[in-house]
Amino acid sequence: MKKILCLVVLGMICLVMLAAAPEEKMPKPQYDEKGQLLRPTDYREWMFLSAGFGMNYSPEPGSHEMFTNVFVQRWAYDEFAKSGKWPEQSMFVIDEREAASRSSINQKGHYQTDLMGLAVEVKDSSRNPDKWAYYGFAADSKSSGAMAHGNSCWACHDAHAAVEHTFVQFYPTLKTVAKQFGTYNEEREKVADAK
């Protein structure tokens, strides 16, 4: 009888400990009552994939230089590492920051300054018939509607991204993974005329 009582007490202690354990943080897309994507919070604590400088889709120089920093949720990154595929509800946040070069003790180079805006890419086939949707946030926006079907972001990613709608060819830590799983499209590295 004592043995049974000890097992019951031990079982209850385990249940209490499980209930008190902090919930694992797995950020997923959140939407408001209008169906607009809420601005992802704490995205700078996610997995950093890559940064670009001076990324411009035009052959002409832009009016300003900026950095683009790409982040994805840790759980989505881990899933990709196991399969070479992005799971549903993966979110990529492109943090767009102004570049500066004159306020540093360094004589050359650039560094990041103020946030200009965010671009967010979401894989969610329950909301998007094309699986992927694109959202743009001004520096202070709290929510954003999806860009129209067939928008220029969607079309470019569809035509040039190496894995699904993502530019894994520019994410050195994931390119090898995608190649190992056979999900990498080698042809997408040829971007001589990516219009």
Predicted regions and their residues:
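Sequence context surrounding c-type heme c attachment/ligation sites in exported
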Residues: 23-32, 39-47, 51-56, 83-195
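Bacterial N-terminal signal peptides that target proteins for export
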Residues: 1-8
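Bacterial N-terminal signal peptides
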Residues: 8-16
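Secretory pathway targeting signatures of secreted, lumenal, and periplasmic proteins
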Residues: 47-71
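Bacterial Sec-dependent signal peptides at the C-terminal "C-region" and cleavage site
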Residues: 16-24
